[in-house]
Amino acid sequence: MSQYTDYIIIGAGSAGCVLANRLSSHSKNNVTLFEAGPSNNTWKVDMPSALLYVMHDPKYNWKYYTEPEPYLNNRSLYCPRGKMLGGCSSHNGMVFARGHKEDFDRWESYGLDQWSYNKVLPYYKKLETWSGKNNLRGKDGPLKVNKSQIDKKFPLFNAVLKAAKEAGYNIFDDSNSLSNEGFGTFDVTIDKGVRQSIPKAYLDPIKNRKNLQIVKKTYVKKIIFKDKVAIGVEYIKNNKTHYFYANKEVILSAGSINSPKILQLSGIGNAAHLKDFGIPIINDLKGVGENLQDHLEIYIQYKSKKKETLYDLSTNFISQGIEGSKWFTFKKGKLAHSHLELGGFVKTNKNYSHPNLQFHFFPSLVINHGLKNPTFDAFQFHACPNRPKSRG
């Protein structure tokens, strides 16, 4: 492999894959995409219901844990991050949810004039091929997005919608419309029973481009600087250290945890912190590796009187064999769904301008992040604040 290229992209997550596609579309650009993990070309990624298996496999996941949380009984919470082509798009729940219009417009009011809803809408439309009818949706983008029909296939999902309607909530038809307050089935990145990851949308169609090289199972340790200009990377492959250089740009796209980590190892961050580890200072930039903000989900769990949950599928080898044959043969059945495909957006205060709480419904129990199987029929609701205030 040549030790020089025009563009180095560190991290083949969602953004890295899109960048590799865009930059290599110009034949004069040579692009090298580095990924620490392996390919995502496995049935465990393609099968929508197998997401928990991938989410706990160290081959495909960084398996991070938070520092002990003082307001959560000092518990360390599991924080899965994708470690393969596609990053988290290869192991997430496949729910496709745009940000709310008012959230984008609030960013604009802070001075980010390129982040208003009207400015980002063309990119949302550009990326998707949506199966429904709506002039706010895309028709010929690389990512296939479909409205889930899970409520028409499994009675428990339909019962949730009926309950929401009886409780006075709106039942929306398009979860990504301008007015999505209420409950309904979500849009999903599942097409014909198969996960539509970002590599499937952005890398597979261009894998034969001669000016793009994708280097997997390669850990980028740090960025190399010359006169405070990024000129290359130091990386580890097969337990050996190598160096690679960019004629034009080094693009750091390694996610919300690994990007600041690489910056710090490269000498960019809080100087006092870096000195503790003997790292030469390139730029004393406070804030790097701090202020992480995430959404904390709370599970509300109920025992079910009816055997319409996923309990049998998660514990019965015969059921697993039957459903497995349906998926591997026809890409149909229970395994063709993530089962996180129904929920809602609500306001906890009627005076709020738009929803601040999101719900997901799941027809089983998730115990210890899915590491332990349930022992009876049950279901749960996931409650998640859309605009949390806490920061790391």
Predicted regions located by residue number:
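FAD cofactor-binding and catalytic pocket of flavoenzymes
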Residues: Q301-G392
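Glycine-rich loop(s) and the adjacent beta-strand/alpha-helix scaffold that form part
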Residues: N30, G37-T42, I223-K226, G232-I322
